Amino acid sequence: FEGNKLPSKIVTKSYIIDEPNNLPILSITAFPETLFGREIGIYTNEIKSREAPVNVQLFEKDGNMAFEVDAGLRLTGQASFQYPQKPLTIETASKYGDEVIDYPVFSNRPFEQYTSIYLRNSGTQDNRHTMFRDALQHTIVINQMDLEAQAYRPVATYINGQYWGIYNIREKLDDNYLVAHHGIDPDNIDYLEYEFQPEPIVLAGDTKAYFALQNFLSQNSMNIEAN
């Protein structure tokens, strides 16, 4: 903070001492007020419309750091984001410092870079029970059936040094997922999501083709092979 000098990049280090290491460790560091502040804290106030800048470090079970990124953190999910342990999305962007997570996060996927990962709390149905039922279902069919499935790995999570429980790291189901898995032109994706309202939320593209398909299905018989 010396006068007439440019500030340097913030350096973040995580030290997990004398804690069980039977799971990989995910350490998230942020300015406390951006997560838990009474006025601007996205976690305390359950704000889903804004990201908080964070540093994220993943340590494998052998203690070696797998990756470190400066990224954005936002609340995700629907009803489950009201739980004490909230679902979170970590998304890289140049404005935070890193554009990708340069690491093969999931052993059963061929990808070595990710722009986002999803920290799932096992959802409304399973957060307070097994914590892995949804992930187990995806693991059973992944690379075995012609179905969309999200890779998963559990991690012991710390936020600002405080243990935050087990999260399931999942592939983020978004337009980047579709590009990576299917080679789709990112400018030719309509990605819609329903969240407790009759009209879809447009995350990418628009609703024209979707509603045209709905109209076709409602006005034409699917018993006719040509349809």
Give residue ranges: language-model regions.
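Phosphate-handling architecture centered on phosphoinositide signaling
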Residues: F1-N227
